[in-house]
Amino acid sequence: MYFARTLSKNDLHKEAAEVFEKAVNMDTARVELLKEMGSEYEAVKDYDKAIGAYKRYIDQAKDVKLNDYFNLGKVYYTAGASIRPTEDGVVMTESDSMRMVDYLKGADSLFAHVVEKAPESYLGYLFRGRANWAIDNPQAPKLAKPFYEQAIAVMEKDPQKNAAGLIEAYRFMGVHYIGLEDYPASLEYWKKILELNPDNAEAKRMAEVLPQYIQQ
């Protein structure tokens, strides 16, 4: 597989993926190559082929790790999140919307498996929040909220280590409460962001603006 890996190092990812695929098809016992094949297809944003490769690995390998499920979930999530209108103001087609939802539901299912097997980790909760928020649905914030709350509960045990994830989750909560016009609740989350990163421009702006709405 030296040739395939050399192609990959030279950013010829599609060509590398095809070499890996031929090798696996010629010798189906070489299951470990499926992950490399999936990674190469992922690099060229051929998400369907990447998903297919990772799923084959999970189905066939004897030493599947929880991280393999997590990584497959991330590919599903990236595939779903990549489906957007091509121009501002253009409504997404029904078929694209259905494809996006299917990918994101696939991601959510895999992240739910991660939560089940590793409830002490914040990653499953955080990515379930991301997947549900990305769904093009008015109920998306409501669907995502419990997962972000669970992620926060885990991450707040070590705020400095988990600062990036906490800022993301606090931002979601802040935006969510603005949508509900619960400005005091929203303000608390922007303040939490500033405790972790006093230079966060968005949080500074919201901390200045929201008190005006609270006083009205």
Regions found by a protein language model. Name each.
Residues M1-L180, E202-Q215:
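Alpha-solenoid helical repeat scaffolds
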